[in-house]
């Protein structure tokens, strides 16, 4: 009987520590509901690197120079307004069960379909992008009353099989993804500016969402490392870049 009690306590402590580790590892990447699902189903989690098809978003602020000039030497003011912007955009990623990968200056990277499965990852990525643009409109109306210049946004969305998992050094690692598909998502975001659109969508993403969202062809672009050009499109409601 005593052995059974010890075994029970040991199992309880082990499960508790596992849940705490999952919360520590993914609490800043995922919504609370997603973290709880992982805690209840730790077998769904593959912490080693694995190949998975993901839908990846990169975002970047447009008009940052005007915003920075508005604040001048008020570094605290600039930091606060950027944090407000990032908070509003991140909320949409987490609400749609995306994984927030990282902030890169005033840019964001997020993806869908890892660590938990998401059969509609491409649709959720595009839905999130549209909601982010909607939130941007509301945010700009709010800060306009404070005399802040409007924020613009460029987004790139790509779907591809990439490597995802814990990556880094023995001192620090992050749950992230890498591969040509990730690089292309970043390049697509960069194409939003010269093509004067808010959102640029890659070919595989378009294949998955074409029955839900109407997209417009933009061009066939050359991409370093690829022999054939990449057909890029934009969602119909984002044909004009918000500056």
Where in the sequence are the language-model features?
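Regulatory cytosolic signal-relay segments
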Residues: 5-52, 66-69, 73-76, 80
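Helical mechanochemical/support elements of P-loop NTPase systems and associated helical scaffolds
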Residues: 22, 34, 78-81, 85, ...
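Catalytic NTP-binding/metal-coordinating core of nucleotidyl cyclase/transferase enzymes
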Residues: 45-127, 175
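Alpha-helical scaffold within the catalytic cores of cyclic-nucleotide enzymes
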Residues: 81-98, 114-155, 159, 180-193, ...
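Cytosolic regulatory/linker segments at or just downstream of nucleotide-handling modules
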Residues: 162, 191-235, 239, 243
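Cytochrome P450 core scaffold surrounding the K-helix E-X-X-R motif
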Residues: 166-169
